[in-house]
Amino acid sequence: MASTTGEDGEVAATSRYPLCNADEREGQRLSLLQKLGDPITVRWFERLGVGPGWRCVELGAGGGSIAEWLSDCVGPTGRVTAVDRDTSLLEPLAASRANVEVVKGDLCELELPESRFDLVHSRSVLMHVPCSDRVLEQAVRCLAPGGRVFFEETDGAPGQELSDAPEPYRAVFGPILARWTWARSIADTLRRLGLADVEDDVRQDPLEGGTDKSEFWKFTLGSVAELQEKALSSEERAAELRSQGLDPGELLRELPAMLALLDDPGFSVPFTARHRVTGRRPA
């Protein structure tokens, strides 16, 4: 049976990331994220040559679908370490797979063993944590010679550059997209850290109503709205959000109209750019 490392293990558990995997809405959101993203992620793994015997670490493993695929791919001679601050959805995987270790902890306090892994992967996680560059440093440090990193993160520039956006879109998504800038720096950081063959594949990703992606965003906005409502009950927290360019009241006022647009098959706007960044540690 595989192991689960908890608060007393190599990573301390805290809650910097605001959405809880155990929450019913978040579970549905993660399922949609897996449906949308897993086929693309798997194609990239195949392109990188992931196979039997590889030692892999998944940072922010979420619902565990990618860790499960990696477990099947690397086989009994390989190893998969799945890291998340909330491991409730990962524990069944750890209990049933001899080649899977689940680590419960905070990525900002992550200490991975040096020169250990053949693959480090993360998807739609590092853009949300305050220590993203530190995690990149840890990822490079833990690569074995010849090992690969693969990061999938989102840039909000396309949606920010939309001049004629509907008001609900501007009010709800404008402040969110404005904060998503980190992804464009990943490739340069990896080069600075000494990786070779660094590639940044960037693809535009529109937002269209009546799709799985819009359904994903309905769940996401529901969780965000709950956080905003809590902020309104705390003047200190509300002031902090306003200092970041976020207006909880405006978001909540415009949210019903935005949710209606997400249900409308005729709604389509430029939204994000997806960065898929790979790099290799020289042998």
Please provide the spans of the model-predicted regions.
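Class I SAM-dependent methyltransferase Rossmann-like catalytic core
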Residues: T14-D38
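Conserved catalytic/acceptor-binding region of the Class I
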Residues: F150-S234
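A short acidic, Gly/Pro-enriched loop at the edge of an enzyme's catalytic core
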Residues: E109-V120
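Conserved alpha-helix/loop element of class I SAM-dependent methyltransferases that forms part
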Residues: K35-P52, W69
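Class I SAM-dependent methyltransferase SAM/SAH-binding core
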Residues: V57, G62-L110, R134
